[in-house]
Amino acid sequence: MQPIISFEQFNFQYKHAAQPTVKDITFHIYPGEKVLIAGRSGSGKSTLAHCMNGLIPFSYEGTSTGNILIAGKDPRKKSVFELSKHVGTILQDQDAQFIGLTVEEDVAFYLENECVNQDEMKKIVSESLKKVGMHTFHKQSPHELSGGQKQTVSLAGLLTTNAPMLLFDEPLANLDPASSLHTIELIKNIHKQYNKTIVIIEHRIEEMLNLDLDKIILIDEGEIVAIDTPERILASNILPSIGLREPMYIEGLKRLHFDSNNDVIYPLENLHKESISGVIKEWMEKKAFCKDTPTKKELLKVENLSFSYPNKQKGLENVNLSIYEGEIVALLGHNGAGKSTLAHSLIGINKTKNSRILIDGVNINSWSIRKRGEIIFYVMQNPNHMITQSTVIEEVSFTLKLKKVSKEEIKFRAEEALKICGLYPFRNWPIQALSYGQKKRLTIASVLTANPKLIILDEPTAGQDYYHYKQFMSFIRKLAKKGISFIFITHDMNLALEYADRAIVLHEGRIIANHTASIVLGHPATLQRANLKESSLFKLVKFSGIANPEKFMELYFDDIRREEGV
């Protein structure tokens, strides 16, 4: 069988770059395969994707050597339009992909360019939307849809092209756990029904394993470092060495010093149950200790907070909570549960009545958004909605300039924030040259220069690889130890388990759980009600059959924090 995608000793260097971004690339993908290309930010994986769909060299100029064939043809000699008949692409930034004013208009875009007659076009659009379960949304604006729905509409548009290859650029970046599972199931179904070749660019290895991948291609610093099956990749210990995260249960096995005797450790069900149970029980006996819980001062207190939108839709109902100085709190729940509504109420965008929001005991209900913004900072999920300046250093310095801070202090604080967020080498870059993940880190760096008391972060690690995830979260912990409080609005259960002191779960505008993350995320009824995902570590512990899996989870993450001095 001939490969449908073929790279042989391929190199590419961007027009103004000092050296090649990808070097000596050789791999083959065959028709009907499901392949993950994974690597940390800046590894070159997106460059490979752009070579496949024609954005290189037609949108991003540069020089290339070696061979590349897509469906037997050299894409460098074809137009982007011609390549789109072979490779359909779904971008990470879904909003940038929409063209039509309604869902059906957007799905029809390719057909309009092909001059398909209107009756046939309506039929194909309707069939494509039915295939992905979005036919009832055909008259809605794409921008009114949730992240998962936008992803699904984009896929419906690709199905109209009949392209044999589908290329996904970080398809799970902005989705909640339920939407992520839906997207993966949708891709699996499309593959099963139409035998499409699926290529996914991602650094979330664990989530993508649900796709039943044929192989994983790992790239680091522009070079291929491994091509193998998921089973062999996970058994090789290569992922941490190139800044990628292993599934949490495999990290747990290593921490427990579990000896697999060279048995296959993926999938989890292949493990020997009695061996796992014995190792966990032995570890728990050694690690049992009294948890030190120092008393902290209350920073934020919310009393009887309710909010309804103008259309009478209930956003929040009788919310009561406290946040303490230096505390890290994960705010969890499915899309539409009220997480963003609560955040907007705290910063003053939503005007609330008959409730009290207190900071250090002072009622701030009457405070303006600007005055609240001196104490409470909110970092949006989409970095493009926050960036206002043209270069990296100007963006990070902007708030300090407004406060008339001295030039010397601005330079020092801006550069320190950029170093922490891994952006110092790019300080003089134009912002449009940054990746999505780099823009995300830039918005966070901008906030850190202002020394707030409470920072609300909407999906703080979305679009970031594991290396920058760890680096950034270590910095957040240092800030928390200095007394700054954090609220994370997140769908990342691993983030909540590892870094949150407490997890608050919202469902239909009400708080349904408020406890340590290990207790909350080990409670099946809460997870199901809030559309949250069970961690693979908790699945491992349940699989072992031990009597108190929640206790293990609490001990496990307390032990990690103790080792890190938190």
Swiss-Prot record:
Localisation per UniProt entry: Cell membrane
SMART domains: AAA (SM00382)
Residues where ATP 1 binds: G39, R40, S41, G42, S43, G44, K45, S46
InterPro entries cross-referenced by the UniProt entry: AAA+_ATPase (IPR003593), ABC_Co_transporter (IPR022216), ABC_transporter-like_ATP-bd (IPR003439), ABC_transporter-like_CS (IPR017871), ABC_transpr_CbiO/EcfA_su (IPR015856), ECF_ABC_transporter_ATP-bd (IPR050095), P-loop_NTPase (IPR027417)
Taxonomy, superkingdom: Bacteria
EC supergroup of this enzyme: translocase
PROSITE patterns per UniProt: ABC_TRANSPORTER_1, ABC_TRANSPORTER_2
Name of the molecule in the record: Putative ABC transporter ATP-binding protein BT9727_2424
Organism expressing this protein natively: Bacillus thuringiensis subsp. konkukian (strain 97-27)
